[in-house]
Amino acid sequence: MLGLVVLATLALAVNGVYQVLQKPTELFFPVSGGLNKIPEETWSRYAPIFKKHATEVTTAPFLAALAQVEASGNPIARTYWRWSWRPHFFELYRPASSAVGMYQITDGTFAQARQLCIHDHHVVREGPWNDWHACWMNDLYSRVIPSHAVELVSAYLTANTDELLARYHRNNVSLQQRQQLATVIHLCGAGAGAAYVRQGLHAVPGQHCGDQDVAVYLGRVQAMTRLFNRLQAQDSAS
C-alpha cells in the first residue's frame, strides 16, 4: 500500500513539473487569486492602459469589461486543472487550456495577435525592422504584462471584427453590434465570429464555446461594459 502511495505521489510530481514546463505561468498559482479585483479597482488600476490602446471597436470600457468578465482584472489569472481519461500520461491531469492572463489569451490567439499592435488607436501590422510605422519588438510581448495583454486583445479583436464585417458587406452596424461580434471572436474564435455575422449578428440559442453559453457571456460583457462606461463618465466629470 505504501508503495502505491509513493508511486502515485511521484507520478503527480512528475506530471506537475511537466505541466509547468509546458505552461510556466502555472508557477503563479500561489499568489494569483490575491490579484482579483472588483470593477472599480480594475478601472482605477488599468484605465490609462485601456484608454491608450482603445480603438473605435474596442473602447476603453469594453476592454475593461472583457478583463473583468474573463479574470476579475487579474493579470496573471490561470485556468483550472481537470482530469481527462486519455491514453497519454501527461494528458490525464492538466490545465484546462493554454489560456493565461487577464484576457485568458490562448497560445493560438497569442501567436496571431503578436503580429499586430496599436498605434494612435489604430491597428498596425508587423513589418520590416526598419519600418517605424509597423509593429516592432512584438516577440517580447507577454500575456501577463497588462499593457501587452490589452494591446494584443484590442488589436486582434479590432482587426478581426473589421475584416469580417467587410467580408460580408455589413454596413451601418452599431457600436454595440460590433462589440458583440468582437466578444464572440474573443470567446469562440474568428471562425465562430464569421458564423455569427452570417446569422445576422445573433447567437444561436443554446450555443456554447467551451464551458460558456454564448448568449449568457454576451450579456455579461454588455452589462459590464455599461458599468465601465459609467465609471469613465465619472472620471470625466471629476
Map each language-model feature to its residues:
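Extracytoplasmic/luminal low-complexity segments enriched in Pro/Gly and acidic/polar residues
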Residues: 233-238
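Hydrophobic membrane-insertion alpha-helices, especially the h-region
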Residues: 1-17
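Catalytic glycan-binding domains that act on GlcNAc-containing polysaccharides
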Residues: 16-232
